[in-house]
Amino acid sequence: MTEIQKLTNNKEIIAYLAEKFPLCFSLEGEAKPLKIGLFQDLAEALANDEKVSKTQLRQALRQYTSNWRYLHGCRAGAVRVDLNGEPAGILEQEHVEHAAAKLAEAKAKVAERRAVEKANNPKANKKRSVHHSGNKSENKKSAGKKFSNPRQVEQIFVNVDLANLQKGDVVRVKAGDKTTKAEILEVVKEGARVELENGLILTVSADRLFA
């Protein structure tokens, strides 16, 4: 008898749901608003499925409906869908406003985190400058060699969550010891297609994408 392999995290469960109900759930692009009460339909549809439990389904749904892809799709006039992708009512205005507020809150947190990181870097760079201020000629030489771009030395980048990326988002792409700004063109499996500032388009893995 083959042993059932249980799914252990939300990402695996969401991928499983997208495989079982592709017209309802998606892993890329804008997500469709879900039917009110979909959890009950889902629990009944997977009642005999030993891979997932109701508790896991509830947690995975909570994560799915709170990511940026889903919140972007909750706009005025959007149509909810059931497990089969069939229309299940127009999104109510209060839910549109709630989604917009959640999205703004999430983006504000990211912006705040970036601001804190940016604010911390000049302080570190200033300490380095004071430490080396004894000899002007040596300072100039050091600035040319070691500190020509202190941000690259000091700045700490945070890996982005692919589930939160949208087309048009601006990220940083790491190439060796350097990073460059890029715009997301498409989120793909385990990475994203991006356009660099010089116009070059390429696909990069998730571990090279930073906020």
From Swiss-Prot:
GO terms for cellular component: cytosol. InterPro entries: ProQ (IPR023529), ProQ/FinO (IPR016103), ProQ/FinO_sf (IPR036442), ProQ_C (IPR035236). One of its GO terms (biological process) is post-transcriptional regulation of gene expression. Pfam families: ProQ, ProQ_C. Keywords: Chaperone, Cytoplasm, RNA-binding. It comes from the Bacteria. Gene3D superfamilies: ProQ/FinO domain (1.10.1710.10). GO terms for molecular function: RNA strand annealing activity; RNA strand-exchange activity. It is found in: Cytoplasm. Coiled coil: none annotated. Residues 124-134 have a biased composition (Basic residues). Residues 112-148 are annotated as: Disordered. Belongs to the ProQ family. RNA chaperone with significant RNA binding, RNA strand exchange and RNA duplexing activities. NCBIfam families: PRK04950.1. This is RNA chaperone ProQ.
